[in-house]
Amino acid sequence: MGFDKAPSAVSKAKQNIINANLDEFIGVHHVNFFNSTKEVFGNTTILFNPPYGERLNIDVNEFYKKVGDTLKHNYPNSTAWMITSDMQALKHVGLRTSKRIELKNADLDCKFVKYELYEGTRKASKL
């Protein structure tokens, strides 16, 4: 599933998904992610390419905190992956990563991190 506040980004993403013959597996919605909730049963995988400080003029640390809060409260039993070049902001997500991969996105040094989200606590979810 994908979300974006920009209608043009949603339109382009939908067309790319159709061109790749993946439209039965991937949905993209014109929604503010921070107002969204998980709508399917079972594990959901979410991929993030959040705005970097270079791309938008926002309070990046607050933005990343809101991403973490939304994931924690609205997406139980899901997996989230995020690519970012802002290692300081990544600390504000407030969730523990289960995997970290260093890579390049164009000429930016980035990390691709994985978050495993549980209902309640991780310990309780394993019982």
Language model: regions and residue ranges:
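Class I S-adenosyl-L-methionine-dependent methyltransferase catalytic core
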Residues: 1-127
